[in-house]
Amino acid sequence: MGRRPARCYRQIKNKPYPKSRYCRGVPDPKIRIYDVGMKKKGVDEFPFCVHLVSWEKENVSSEALEAARIACNKYMTKYAGKDAFHLRVRVHPFHVLRINKMLSCAGADRLQTGMRGAFGKPQGTCARVSIGQVLLSVRCKDGNSHHAQEALRRAKFKFPARQKIIVSRKWGFTKFNRTDYIKWKSQNRILPDGVNAKLLGCHGPLANRQPGKAFINACT
């Protein structure tokens, strides 16, 4: 017996049902890798960032997430190079899907009880996605921006419903705008922290501050 189609579970109807000590026997999700590519590249290496954003409230199966990750990774590896990007899957399949199996062979009516006790057993997992939530993100150099957008366009076909490809105004995976990042970088206020960055604030004694600037000389 094959897997029930994911369109049967597309709508979000029930409360979240995660794996727990009460919900046992859950099969492992198909997606096991959430960061692909040069995930250890510093924050200054990949300034460009593009997101694949969900435009509907729905369930996305772990099989669909894995298929989208493979499609995006394959295109970027072929056209941009395996060392030229960092792909991150931004949603995790924690919600457990159930199935109430029905027998369809001859004499099945003697064995099953129909809708009596129809809670069901775990069949798979999915991610509960809301409107405007980011599904996939890719950071790369500005020269590979068109490759990243095309890779996410191909990954879009693996998901149900509607998605949009949105080019981020931020620097890479950080929370800072590109113009602000460049300005603060020239002022030595940005401290690289892996794929993210820290902004040095205005803490410390008043004697270390310049008048009219929320910035410490001692931190530079």
From Swiss-Prot:
Pfam families in the record: Ribosomal_L16 (PF00252)
GO molecular function, one term: structural constituent of ribosome
GO CC aspect terms: ribonucleoprotein complex; ribosome
Domain of life assignment: Eukaryota
Listed GO biological process terms: translation
Record key words, sorted: Ribonucleoprotein, Ribosomal protein
Residue ranges that the Swiss-Prot or TrEMBL entry lists as coiled coil: none
Subunit structure: Component of the small ribosomal subunit. Mature ribosomes consist of a small (40S) and a large (60S) subunit. The 40S subunit contains about 33 different proteins and 1 molecule of RNA (18S). The 60S subunit contains about 49 different proteins and 3 molecules of RNA (25S, 5.8S and 5S).
PANTHER family per the UniProt record, alphabetical: 60S RIBOSOMAL PROTEIN L10 (PTHR11726)
Family: Belongs to the universal ribosomal protein uL16 family.
UniProt protein name: Large ribosomal subunit protein uL16
Organism: Vitis riparia
Gene responsible for this protein: RPL10
